[in-house]
């Protein structure tokens, strides 16, 4: 089951989230918005298992990577039973 994976512009390009992901959902892409000149990207969200290891690995104060599990998303939209 895929989950929503959002990357925010607070990403510092450290690659911690990419290395933490057991299913290779994340990768780094070029970006001029930070010192590292790269930012995390999530091109394979269909492979996300929702473990949130990427969130745990993120060293920024405001998590740059956020995973929304399917059941959390439907509940927040009032679609859960």
UniProtKB/Swiss-Prot annotation:
PROSITE patterns: 4FE4S_FER_1, 4FE4S_FER_2. One of its GO terms (molecular function) is electron transfer activity. It is a peripheral membrane protein. SUPFAM superfamilies: 4Fe-4S ferredoxins. Its cofactor is [4Fe-4S] cluster. Keywords: 4Fe-4S, Chloroplast, Electron transport, Iron, Iron-sulfur, Membrane, Metal-binding, Oxidoreductase, Photosynthesis, Photosystem I, Plastid, Repeat, Thylakoid, Transport. GO terms for biological process: photosynthetic electron transport in photosystem I. Its main location: plastid. GO terms for cellular component: chloroplast thylakoid membrane; photosystem I. Its EC number is 1.97.1.12. [4Fe-4S] cluster 2 binds at residues 21, 48, 51, 54. It catalyses: reduced [plastocyanin] + hnu + oxidized [2Fe-2S]-[ferredoxin] = oxidized [plastocyanin] + reduced [2Fe-2S]-[ferredoxin]. Pfam families: Fer4_21 (PF14697). Binds 2 [4Fe-4S] clusters. Cluster 2 is most probably the spectroscopically characterized electron acceptor FA and cluster 1 is most probably FB. Residues 2-31, 39-68 form the 4Fe-4S ferredoxin-type domain. It is found in: Plastid, Chloroplast thylakoid membrane. InterPro entries: 4Fe4S_Fe-S-bd (IPR017896), 4Fe4S_Fe_S_CS (IPR017900), PSI_iron-sulfur_center (IPR050157), PSI_PsaC (IPR017491). [4Fe-4S] cluster 1 binds at residues 11, 14, 17, 58. The eukaryotic PSI reaction center is composed of at least 11 subunits. NCBIfam families: PS_I_psaC. Apoprotein for the two 4Fe-4S centers FA and FB of photosystem I (PSI); essential for photochemical activity. FB is the terminal electron acceptor of PSI, donating electrons to ferredoxin. The C-terminus interacts with PsaA/B/D and helps assemble the protein into the PSI complex. Required for binding of PsaD and PsaE to PSI. PSI is a plastocyanin-ferredoxin oxidoreductase, converting photonic excitation into a charge separation, which transfers an electron from the donor P700 chlorophyll pair to the spectroscopically characterized acceptors A0, A1, FX, FA and FB in turn. This is Photosystem I iron-sulfur center. It comes from Panax ginseng.
């Amino acid at each position: 089951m895929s989950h929503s994976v959002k990357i925010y512009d607070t990403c510092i390009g450290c690659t911690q989230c990419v290395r933490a992901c057991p299913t290779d959902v994340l990768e780094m892409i070029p970006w001029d918005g930070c010192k590292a000149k790269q930012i995390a990207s999530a091109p394979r969200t269909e492979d996300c298992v929702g473990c949130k290891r990427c969130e745990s690995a993120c060293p920024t104060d405001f998590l740059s990577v956020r995973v929304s599990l399917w059941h959390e998303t439907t509940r927040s939209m009032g679609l859960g039973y």
